[in-house]
């Protein structure tokens, strides 16, 4: 059989010789004048390797092997049967990549990938608790997509500090190579491939940071690409009104499958939660399939202990906290107007600094006094809480520069007095003393968290006698990697860290103890901190110790908030509403402290669907475990080139001997893309015969009587019909998604170009840029049209091959 272009038609499973080596065809796609074949090596030098060839430019010879079954020993037959069953997929949506992944099979981690392959959605929010393996779940989705579509492309957007961790996890868990694209790598790729090729389109799987992607020139390069999978890690940082959020929205609108990862999806702001849930919903009707598992749901081995240690303040610290509270509440009363939001933000920063350390408070008061010497206009637009999207460990000067009193001279006098009190208290800090005693007693590795970098420097001095390393947002990537290496390899006992420097890290193999020097006013940060050591794989009971200053707002409000937060998250999971900084500040500094800060479930957002795929995941996990046990320590299946038969006798003799035939059926689309490799078993009795010779067994199983032939044809027809019916909802969803992507490409192209290009009278660069963007758009729309055509062809399913794999006579 030949194609329209005169090329020989190849089928799945055909043996060919290309470039002097033997290959088995795994995928054949024909175009007008050429054909692409994906192959797996089955020769002595290329066994189990994968390659792609282009016909007719790569010449090939078809290898014809005998289809006559081979009578084999019981051991050989058992090997072939087990190998065949291990590779079998009970459904077209069964996972293919999970069996070969280097990870323990935990059922709930399979749920998102199962939902993706079944077509339950195109947008996914994985909101599991910290430490439950969201990276593994997203990695499974990527690996599964690349296994099913060898030409698929995926991109992972992660905080800069987590890029190396993502690369190492993908390599270790899934044997996937994912280069980190930054300015240097993009420049070298562009120089290598030429100016006419988009460097972002060269690699199949890439990792980059949101701060790099948000650059205008990078967004221009990415706007003309459609990705099969887009993963947004720490997605709760991408919901505000910022360049980061704009870049995330643009990429989300170009994702066939969008995966949002965050342990803290609802940070207390309903509007930001709604924006998170609307990412990638360009058409307005695409559901957000959500998964949320608490530690109890996941069956974590050890329950975390989180004791509060009440620290008695010194007399100087008590005076400092009392004076600061008086000042802060006075500012709070005098700045009730929205135009004075900056003053409230400033005093909330001072309160948080005081809970961290007296020295940290003194430094901020010094800066505030200096800034109040040059007061900006009172009607200037001021930021509201929280003042950053990423939780930096140093606040900008603009935060501390808003006056809080109507009488500025009076405020400066109050601040000068506070500064002297704070300097006195800094000479003997109770929390630092308590921390030193605690660390000396536990005698094991620990992570000490604080919100502020200057407090971190104070701790470094206090623990100069201990092997300690620092991790904060001001470190370069090599410095950060060196610090982590010292700690994880056991060369440092203490890791002194801020939230910005440590987000997303896996440190559970090194220690089980986290110590919080202060309680952050964003309560979800406590969960993020504990998640560094409280993760799947932790072999001991994790501890998260909170130091609380007695007689301060930490004890009065924040400690109670932390206790209630833990209880409500145990009940409602990570989607529970929690307060943001603004609500916490109102509770601490308002005239009537509020203790109703914690709400119930998150607000209803249209289109958010909580999917329960536990039953399917349990079945899939059992199948994968069995498949692993059947192929462990055995050779490759690529040497199974002929069907095998055997004659087996049972211990208990049966009254009627039986024959079992197992056929392999390959179902493809009209274009030749393999959709499902299924097995069809048939059984028949052998009446009037008690014992069989070898020759009789071979003849009986090799022959294909008319009755068996009709059964095979009927089974194939049922497979095609059932597959078409089960795939129809998924095809409709994928088709609608592709149409939305094409519409978003057209709509955003003109808007983005207009915002980034300023035409010059004598400079033609803008015109060249528009031409380049138009070319990218045309190419992206062409690929989208190809995708729609492939989806249409997927509705026309057919049997590519059906052949006997193994058979047996049982008596």
Task: State where each predicted segment sits.
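Basic/aromatic-rich interaction segments and small domains that mediate binding to polyanionic partners
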Residues: 20-56
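Inter-lobe coupling linker of SF2 helicases/translocases
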Residues: 195-196, 201-202, 206-227, 237-256, ...
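A short beta-strand element within the Helicase C-terminal
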Residues: 226, 272-275, 506-518, 543-546
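SF2 helicase/translocase NTPase motor core
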Residues: 50-82, 88-114, 121-122, 132-139, ...
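Conserved SF2 helicase motif VI
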Residues: 522-540, 544
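Conserved Helicase C-terminal RecA-like lobe
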Residues: 304-313, 363-493, 801-811
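C-terminal accessory region of SF2 helicases/translocases
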Residues: 72-80, 540-683, 687-692, 731, ...
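SF2 helicase motor core recognition
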Residues: 215-216, 268-269, 456-457, 481, ...
């Amino acid at each position: 059989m030949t194609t329209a272009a005169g090329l020989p038609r190849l089928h799945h499973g055909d043996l060919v010789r290309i470039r002097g080596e033997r290959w088995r065809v795994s995928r054949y796609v024909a175009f007008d004048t050429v054909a692409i074949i994906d192959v797996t090596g089955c020769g002595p030098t290329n066994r189990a390797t994968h390659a792609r060839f282009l016909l007719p430019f790569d010449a090939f010879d078809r290898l014809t092997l005998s289809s006559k079954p081979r009578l084999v020993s019981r051991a050989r037959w058992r090997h072939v049967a087990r190998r065949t069953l291990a590779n079998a997929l009970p459904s077209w949506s069964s996972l293919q990549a999970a069996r070969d992944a280097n990870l323990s099979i935990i059922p709930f981690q399979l749920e998102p990938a199962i939902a993706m392959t079944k077509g339950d959605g195109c947008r996914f929010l994985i909101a599991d608790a910290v430490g439950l393996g969201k990276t593994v779940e997203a990695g499974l989705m990527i690996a599964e997509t690349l296994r099913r579509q060898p030409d698929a492309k995926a991109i992972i957007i992660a905080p800069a500090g987590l890029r190396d961790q993502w690369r190492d996890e993908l390599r270790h868990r899934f044997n996937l190579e994912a280069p980190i694209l930054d300015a240097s790598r993009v420049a070298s790729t562009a120089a290598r491939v030429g100016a006419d090729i988009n460097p972002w389109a060269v690699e199949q799987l890439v990792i980059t940071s949101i701060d790099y992607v948000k650059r205008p020139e990078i967004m221009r390069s990415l706007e003309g690409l459609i990705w099969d999978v887009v993963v947004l890690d720490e997605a709760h940082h991408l919901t505000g009104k910022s360049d980061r959020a704009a870049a995330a929205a643009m990429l989300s609108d170009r994702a066939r499958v969008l995966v949002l990862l965050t342990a803290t999806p609802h940070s207390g702001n309903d509007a930001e939660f709604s924006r998170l849930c609307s990412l990638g919903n360009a058409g307005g009707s695409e559901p957000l399939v959500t998964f949320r598992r608490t530690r109890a749901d996941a069956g974590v081995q050890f329950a975390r202990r989180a004791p509060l240690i009440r620290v008695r303040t010194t007399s100087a610290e008590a005076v400092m906290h009392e004076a600061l509270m008086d000042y802060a509440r006075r500012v709070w009363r005098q700045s009730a107007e929205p135009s004075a939001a900056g003053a409230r933000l400033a005093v909330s920063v001072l309160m948080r600094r005081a809970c961290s350390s007296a020295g940290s408070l003194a430094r901020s008061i010094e800066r505030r006094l200096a800034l109040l010497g040059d007061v900006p206009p009172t009607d200037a637009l001021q930021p509201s809480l929280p003042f950053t999207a990423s939780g930096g460990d140093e606040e900008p000067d603009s935060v501390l520069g808003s006056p809080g009193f109507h009488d500025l001279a009076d405020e400066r006098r109050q601040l000068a007095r506070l500064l002297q009190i704070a300097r006195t208290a800094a000479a003997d800090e109770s929390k630092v003393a308590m921390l030193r005693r605690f660390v000396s007693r536990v005698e094991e590795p620990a992570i000490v968290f604080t919100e502020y970098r200057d407090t971190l420097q104070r701790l470094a001095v206090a623990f100069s006698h201990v092997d300690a390393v620092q991790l904060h947002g001001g470190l370069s990537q090599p410095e950060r990697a060196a610090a982590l290496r010292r700690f994880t390899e056991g060369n440092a006992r203490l890791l002194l860290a801020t939230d910005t420097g440590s987000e997303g890290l896996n440190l559970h193999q090194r220690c089980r103890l986290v110590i919080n020097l202060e309680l952050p006013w964003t309560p979800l940060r406590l969960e993020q901190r504990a998640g560094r050591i409280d993760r799947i794989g932790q072999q001991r009971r994790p501890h998260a110790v909170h130091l609380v200053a007695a007689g301060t707002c930490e004890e009065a409000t924040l400690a109670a908030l932390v206790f209630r937060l833990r209880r409500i998250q145990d009940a409602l999971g990570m989607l529970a509403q929690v307060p943001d900084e603004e609500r916490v500040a109102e509770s601490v500094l308002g005239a009537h402290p509020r203790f109703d800060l914690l709400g119930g479930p998150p607000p209803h957002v249209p289109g958010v669907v909580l999917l329960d795929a536990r039953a399917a995941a349990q079945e899939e996990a059992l199948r994968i475990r069995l498949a692993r046990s059947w192929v462990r320590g055995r050779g490759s299946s690529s040497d199974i080139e002929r069907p095998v038969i055997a004659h087996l006798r049972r211990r208990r003799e049966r009254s009627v001997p039986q024959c079992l035939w197992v056929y392999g059926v390959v179902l493809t689309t009209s274009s030749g893309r393999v959709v499902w490799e299924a097995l069809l078993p048939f059984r028949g009795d052998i009446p009037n015969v008690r014992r069989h010779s070898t020759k009789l067994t071979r003849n009986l199983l090799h022959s294909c009587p008319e009755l068996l032939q009709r059964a095979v044809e009927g089974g194939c027809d049922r497979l095609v019909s059932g597959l078409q019916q089960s795939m129809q909802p998924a095809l409709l969803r994928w088709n609608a998604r592709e149409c939305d992507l094409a519409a978003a490409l057209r709509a955003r192209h003109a808007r983005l170009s207009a915002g980034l290009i300023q035409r010059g009278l004598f400079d033609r660069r803008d015109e060249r840029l528009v031409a380049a963007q138009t070319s990218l758009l045309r190419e992206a729309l062409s690929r989208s049209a190809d995708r729609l055509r492939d989806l249409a062809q997927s509705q026309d399913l057919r049997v590519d091959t059906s052949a006997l794999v193994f058979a047996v006579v049982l008596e």
